[in-house]
Amino acid sequence: MKVEAFIPAVLLLCFGVMLCLKSSCALQIGNNNELKNYISWEDLRVVEDGRIERSFSIKENSNWVTTNANANANATNVRRVIVVDKNGGGDSVTVQGAVDMVPDSNSQRVKIFILPGIYREKVIVPKSKPYISFIGNESYAGDTVISWSDKASDLGCDGKELGTYRTASVSIESDFFCATAITFENTVVAEAGEQGRQAVALRIIGDKAVFYRVRVLGSQDTLFDDNGSHYFYQCYIQGNVDFIFGNAKSLYQDCDIHSTAKRYGAIAAHHRDSETEDTGFSFVNCDISGTGQIYLGRAWGNYSRTVYSNCFIADIITPVGWSDWKHPERQRKVMFGEYNCRGRGAERGGRVPWSKTLTRDEVKPFLGREFIYGDQWLRL
């Protein structure tokens, strides 16, 4: 072969390799950009091979400062972990302190690993800080507790009553949040009929959130499922009056729903107020137990929508099952349905006539993750 012919061939080969590498890099970047708009199991883990991955970024003097356990890792691609230890052995002694370390307009998953303990604080994850995970002790959610005790009649810094939504022990305002193995708690004890004792443990107003094996504990208005699409999987939720309420579109799958009512109360109070709103609560394969004689749901909104499917319902449900919130005009607008539930509390003989026993075709849109458009943002 002539030298003149060999050189162009080598150049073409090198050029081809460079193009392939560039394409591979572009594909990797594209995949990274795509992945941040999903929540996966990886976003709920911090321990691999028995060690904690300690890499995170904080913003200091408007510049990125990166701490990385692996000096060879690319700081823009690694998963980042901030450790919270109330005893001082981590990066922050408070959960809020760890949240504050995350830069505004964050575009990468940041995992906040919260070591066991009771963290008595109010926590807000602001809208400007998406892609945050709260991760506790994977063996038991009760080991890691975020707890506070505000109630609606308490006065805020402005001298005005807090009202319900400002009582939340933990407020999630950002998108693509997820949590596992954490207890969210409000310690205020309330009974049906008491005034000013609404006390929220967890409020979610951000879109596309996942809660896996968390506990949410309270009495009245425990879980404010306010707005957005949310997935609760294998969670434990406890309260007595309207203890799951709001206007989100949420799927509760394989959850334990536990009533602590001494007399009467209600599980769900959905606030859909227009037939054009694409919102609702769907409870699938849940175990509903506890005490009292409570409603499955109350019509907080004119077009409230709540469905129970394939659930075990203990003998704690008042025979009528559902309440129109003393607004009889809502009876023809709400969507309160049950499908294939079992247990004494599932007997529909005494149900209000404006609730529905759903058919298989009618319940199908409520049964899976497609109810919350999970194919667009879940990789679980």
UniProtKB/Swiss-Prot annotation:
Active site, UniProt feature: D221, D242
Signal peptide: 1-26
Disruption phenotype: The mature pollen grains are arranged in a tetrad.
Domain of life of the native organism: Eukaryota
EC number(s) reported in the record: 3.1.1.11
Marked site (Transition state stabilizer) residue numbers: Q220
Gene Ontology biological-process annotations: cell wall modification; pectin catabolic process
GO molecular-function term, one example from the UniProt record: pectinesterase activity
Described purpose of this protein according to its UniProt entry: Pectinesterase required for cell type-specific pectin degradation to separate microspores.
Family: Belongs to the pectinesterase family.
Name of the molecule in the record: Pectinesterase QRT1
Biological source species: Arabidopsis thaliana
